[in-house]
Protein backbone atom coordinates (compact mmCIF):
# COMPACT_ATOMS: atom_id res chain seq x y z
CA UNK A 1 0.00 0.00 0.00
CA UNK A 2 1.75 3.13 -1.21
CA UNK A 3 5.39 3.65 -2.14
CA UNK A 4 8.60 4.88 -0.57
CA UNK A 5 11.48 7.01 -1.78
CA UNK A 6 14.52 6.30 0.36
CA UNK A 7 17.48 8.49 1.24
CA UNK A 8 20.17 6.88 3.38
CA UNK A 9 22.79 9.15 4.91
CA UNK A 10 25.30 9.05 7.75
CA UNK A 11 24.53 10.80 11.04
CA UNK A 12 25.93 14.19 12.00
CA UNK A 13 25.70 16.22 15.19
CA UNK A 14 24.10 19.53 14.51
CA UNK A 15 22.05 22.18 16.25
CA UNK A 16 18.92 20.42 15.02
CA UNK A 17 17.63 17.32 16.77
CA UNK A 18 19.11 14.28 15.03
CA UNK A 19 16.50 11.65 14.22
CA UNK A 20 17.15 8.20 12.83
CA UNK A 21 14.07 8.16 10.58
CA UNK A 22 11.55 10.67 9.32
CA UNK A 23 8.47 9.35 7.54
CA UNK A 24 6.57 11.81 5.37
CA UNK A 25 2.90 10.87 5.38
CA UNK A 26 0.93 9.13 8.12
CA UNK A 27 -1.42 7.19 5.86
CA UNK A 28 -1.44 3.48 5.05
CA UNK A 29 2.19 3.13 3.95
CA UNK A 30 3.69 5.55 6.48
CA UNK A 31 1.95 3.96 9.47
CA UNK A 32 2.73 0.47 8.18
CA UNK A 33 6.41 1.32 7.90
CA UNK A 34 6.53 2.79 11.42
CA UNK A 35 4.65 -0.25 12.74
CA UNK A 36 7.19 -2.62 11.16
CA UNK A 37 10.16 -0.61 12.44
CA UNK A 38 8.71 -0.70 15.96
CA UNK A 39 8.36 -4.50 15.79
CA UNK A 40 11.90 -5.01 14.49
CA UNK A 41 14.61 -5.86 17.02
CA UNK A 42 17.09 -3.95 14.88
CA UNK A 43 15.09 -0.70 14.72
CA UNK A 44 12.59 -0.59 17.60
CA UNK A 45 14.89 1.70 19.63
CA UNK A 46 15.39 4.11 16.71
CA UNK A 47 14.07 7.66 16.92
CA UNK A 48 11.21 8.02 14.43
CA UNK A 49 9.19 11.07 13.44
CA UNK A 50 6.03 10.78 11.34
CA UNK A 51 4.95 14.03 9.68
CA UNK A 52 1.30 14.12 8.61
CA UNK A 53 -0.66 17.18 7.46
CA UNK A 54 -4.13 15.83 8.30
CA UNK A 55 -4.87 15.46 12.01
CA UNK A 56 -8.42 14.22 11.49
CA UNK A 57 -8.07 11.11 9.35
CA UNK A 58 -11.18 8.98 9.77
CA UNK A 59 -13.02 6.62 7.41
CA UNK A 60 -11.64 8.52 4.44
CA UNK A 61 -11.11 5.43 2.27
CA UNK A 62 -11.28 1.67 1.99
CA UNK A 63 -8.55 -0.75 1.00
CA UNK A 64 -8.98 -4.08 -0.73
CA UNK A 65 -6.30 -6.70 -1.23
CA UNK A 66 -5.74 -10.36 -2.11
CA UNK A 67 -4.62 -12.79 0.56
CA UNK A 68 -4.38 -16.55 0.92
CA UNK A 69 -5.62 -17.95 4.22
CA UNK A 70 -5.72 -16.02 7.48
CA UNK A 71 -3.96 -12.67 7.69
CA UNK A 72 -2.70 -10.08 10.15
CA UNK A 73 -5.60 -7.72 9.51
CA UNK A 74 -8.49 -10.20 9.57
CA UNK A 75 -9.93 -8.78 12.80
CA UNK A 76 -10.30 -5.40 11.06
CA UNK A 77 -12.00 -6.62 7.89
CA UNK A 78 -15.35 -5.21 6.89
CA UNK A 79 -15.85 -8.11 4.49
CA UNK A 80 -14.14 -10.63 2.24
CA UNK A 81 -15.17 -12.43 -0.93
CA UNK A 82 -14.36 -15.92 -2.20
CA UNK A 83 -15.46 -15.33 -5.82
CA UNK A 84 -14.95 -12.51 -8.33
CA UNK A 85 -16.87 -11.76 -11.52
CA UNK A 86 -15.59 -10.25 -14.77
CA UNK A 87 -18.18 -9.17 -17.32
CA UNK A 88 -18.36 -7.53 -20.75
CA UNK A 89 -20.73 -7.55 -23.71
CA UNK A 90 -19.26 -10.90 -24.80
CA UNK A 91 -17.97 -12.51 -21.59
CA UNK A 92 -19.46 -13.26 -18.18
CA UNK A 93 -16.99 -15.19 -16.03
CA UNK A 94 -17.05 -15.87 -12.28
CA UNK A 95 -13.86 -17.21 -10.71
CA UNK A 96 -13.74 -19.21 -7.48
CA UNK A 97 -10.65 -17.99 -5.61
CA UNK A 98 -10.14 -21.20 -3.67
CA UNK A 99 -7.94 -20.57 -0.62
CA UNK A 100 -7.49 -16.93 -1.62
CA UNK A 101 -9.87 -14.15 -0.60
CA UNK A 102 -10.42 -10.59 -1.74
CA UNK A 103 -10.44 -8.67 1.54
CA UNK A 104 -11.67 -5.19 2.46
CA UNK A 105 -10.94 -3.00 5.46
CA UNK A 106 -12.01 0.52 6.34
CA UNK A 107 -9.28 3.05 7.02
CA UNK A 108 -10.45 4.17 10.48
CA UNK A 109 -10.04 0.75 12.07
CA UNK A 110 -6.58 0.48 10.48
CA UNK A 111 -5.53 3.98 11.59
CA UNK A 112 -6.80 3.39 15.13
CA UNK A 113 -4.97 0.09 15.59
CA UNK A 114 -1.65 1.28 14.20
CA UNK A 115 -1.76 4.54 16.16
CA UNK A 116 -2.37 2.47 19.30
CA UNK A 117 0.52 0.11 18.54
CA UNK A 118 2.93 2.89 17.58
CA UNK A 119 2.07 4.91 20.70
CA UNK A 120 3.49 2.11 22.85
CA UNK A 121 6.97 2.93 21.52
CA UNK A 122 8.20 6.10 23.23
CA UNK A 123 10.85 6.72 20.57
CA UNK A 124 8.17 7.44 17.94
CA UNK A 125 6.59 10.87 17.49
CA UNK A 126 3.71 11.92 15.25
CA UNK A 127 3.48 15.61 14.41
CA UNK A 128 0.72 17.16 12.35
CA UNK A 129 2.71 19.50 10.14
CA UNK A 130 2.73 20.00 6.39
CA UNK A 131 6.07 19.27 4.72
CA UNK A 132 7.24 22.07 2.44
CA UNK A 133 10.42 20.40 1.18
CA UNK A 134 13.52 18.38 1.98
CA UNK A 135 17.15 18.35 0.87
CA UNK A 136 19.90 15.73 0.90
CA UNK A 137 23.02 17.26 2.46
CA UNK A 138 25.25 14.28 1.78
CA UNK A 139 25.57 13.09 5.38
CA UNK A 140 22.06 13.94 6.57
CA UNK A 141 18.67 15.07 5.28
CA UNK A 142 17.00 18.36 6.21
CA UNK A 143 13.20 18.34 6.26
CA UNK A 144 11.21 21.56 6.35
CA UNK A 145 7.60 21.97 7.44
CA UNK A 146 5.43 25.06 7.76
CA UNK A 147 6.32 25.16 11.47
CA UNK A 148 9.75 23.59 11.95
CA UNK A 149 12.96 22.19 10.48
CA UNK A 150 14.13 18.64 11.22
CA UNK A 151 17.21 16.54 10.51
CA UNK A 152 17.44 12.79 10.00
CA UNK A 153 19.75 10.05 8.83
CA UNK A 154 17.11 8.33 6.69
CA UNK A 155 14.03 9.81 5.04
CA UNK A 156 11.05 7.86 3.70
CA UNK A 157 8.65 9.82 1.52
CA UNK A 158 5.14 8.53 0.76
CA UNK A 159 3.82 11.88 -0.49
CA UNK A 160 2.86 11.60 -4.15
CA UNK A 161 4.28 14.34 -6.39
CA UNK A 162 2.29 14.92 -9.58
CA UNK A 163 5.03 17.14 -10.99
CA UNK A 164 7.31 14.14 -11.49
CA UNK A 165 4.77 12.61 -13.88
CA UNK A 166 3.82 15.86 -15.57
CA UNK A 167 7.42 16.77 -16.35
CA UNK A 168 8.19 13.54 -18.23
CA UNK A 169 7.14 13.23 -21.87
CA UNK A 170 8.07 9.63 -22.63
CA UNK A 171 4.83 8.01 -21.46
CA UNK A 172 1.17 9.04 -21.43
CA UNK A 173 -0.24 9.56 -17.94
CA UNK A 174 -3.53 7.80 -17.20
CA UNK A 175 -5.32 8.25 -13.91
CA UNK A 176 -7.41 5.64 -12.14
CA UNK A 177 -10.37 7.54 -10.73
CA UNK A 178 -13.76 6.61 -9.39
CA UNK A 179 -16.77 7.59 -7.36
CA UNK A 180 -18.73 5.19 -5.18
CA UNK A 181 -22.10 4.96 -3.50
CA UNK A 182 -23.21 2.77 -0.64
CA UNK A 183 -26.62 1.46 -1.67
CA UNK A 184 -29.42 -0.52 -0.04
CA UNK A 185 -32.01 -2.47 -2.03
CA UNK A 186 -35.58 -3.21 -0.87
CA UNK A 187 -35.22 -6.92 -1.68
CA UNK A 188 -32.25 -9.35 -1.63
CA UNK A 189 -30.27 -9.10 -4.89
CA UNK A 190 -26.58 -9.62 -4.06
CA UNK A 191 -24.46 -12.73 -3.75
CA UNK A 192 -22.49 -11.92 -0.60
CA UNK A 193 -19.68 -14.30 -1.60
CA UNK A 194 -19.09 -12.66 -4.99
CA UNK A 195 -17.45 -9.32 -5.80
CA UNK A 196 -18.27 -7.88 -9.21
CA UNK A 197 -14.68 -6.98 -9.94
CA UNK A 198 -15.03 -5.43 -13.39
CA UNK A 199 -18.31 -5.01 -15.27
CA UNK A 200 -17.42 -3.53 -18.66
CA UNK A 201 -21.00 -3.50 -19.96
CA UNK A 202 -21.19 0.25 -19.31
CA UNK A 203 -20.48 2.62 -22.26
CA UNK A 204 -16.71 2.83 -22.77
CA UNK A 205 -16.59 6.16 -24.65
CA UNK A 206 -13.19 5.24 -26.13
CA UNK A 207 -11.72 4.79 -22.64
CA UNK A 208 -11.53 2.03 -20.03
CA UNK A 209 -14.66 2.20 -17.84
CA UNK A 210 -16.28 -0.36 -15.57
CA UNK A 211 -18.48 -0.87 -12.53
CA UNK A 212 -17.12 -2.44 -9.36
CA UNK A 213 -19.61 -3.88 -6.86
CA UNK A 214 -18.75 -5.13 -3.36
CA UNK A 215 -21.75 -6.62 -1.51
CA UNK A 216 -21.81 -6.70 2.29
CA UNK A 217 -25.22 -8.31 2.71
CA UNK A 218 -27.88 -9.47 0.26
CA UNK A 219 -29.28 -5.90 0.28
CA UNK A 220 -26.22 -3.69 0.98
CA UNK A 221 -23.27 -2.97 -1.30
CA UNK A 222 -20.65 -0.48 -2.38
CA UNK A 223 -20.84 0.34 -6.07
CA UNK A 224 -18.09 2.32 -7.79
CA UNK A 225 -17.84 3.75 -11.29
CA UNK A 226 -14.17 3.41 -12.22
CA UNK A 227 -12.15 4.77 -15.15
CA UNK A 228 -8.62 4.76 -16.49
CA UNK A 229 -8.26 7.99 -18.45
CA UNK A 230 -6.21 11.14 -18.81
CA UNK A 231 -8.75 13.50 -17.22
CA UNK A 232 -11.18 13.33 -14.33
CA UNK A 233 -14.93 13.73 -14.79
CA UNK A 234 -17.35 16.12 -13.16
CA UNK A 235 -18.98 14.56 -10.10
CA UNK A 236 -22.35 14.57 -11.87
CA UNK A 237 -20.98 12.32 -14.65
CA UNK A 238 -19.92 9.60 -12.22
CA UNK A 239 -23.26 9.77 -10.44
CA UNK A 240 -25.22 9.71 -13.68
CA UNK A 241 -23.38 6.56 -14.78
CA UNK A 242 -24.16 4.84 -11.47
CA UNK A 243 -27.84 5.82 -11.73
CA UNK A 244 -28.03 4.46 -15.28
CA UNK A 245 -26.38 1.21 -14.21
CA UNK A 246 -28.77 0.75 -11.29
CA UNK A 247 -31.78 1.44 -13.51
CA UNK A 248 -30.55 -1.14 -16.01
CA UNK A 249 -30.22 -3.71 -13.23
CA UNK A 250 -33.69 -2.81 -11.88
Predicted regions and their residues:
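Extreme N-terminal leader/targeting segments of oxidoreductases
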Residues: 1-21
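N-terminal Rossmann-like FAD-binding beta1-loop-alpha1 element of flavoenzymes
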Residues: 19-45, 49
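Short, well-ordered alpha-helices that flank and scaffold nucleotide-derived cofactor binding pockets
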Residues: 35, 39, 116, 215
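N-terminal FAD cofactor-binding segment of flavoenzymes
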Residues: 49-90
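N-terminal Rossmann-like dinucleotide/flavin-binding domain of flavoprotein oxidoreductases
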Residues: 81, 85-91, 106-125
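Short beta-strand to alpha-helix junction loop
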Residues: 97-116, 229-237
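Predominantly flavin-linked oxidoreductase catalytic cores and closely associated redox partners
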Residues: 125-246
Amino acid sequence: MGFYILYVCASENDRLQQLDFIILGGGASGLQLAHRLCKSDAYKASSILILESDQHKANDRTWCFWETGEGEWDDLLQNQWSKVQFKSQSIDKTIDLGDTSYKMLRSKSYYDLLHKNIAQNKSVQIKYERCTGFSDKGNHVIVNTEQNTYQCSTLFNSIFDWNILRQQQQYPVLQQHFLGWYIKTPTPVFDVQKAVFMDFTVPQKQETRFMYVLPFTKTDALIEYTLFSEKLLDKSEYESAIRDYLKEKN
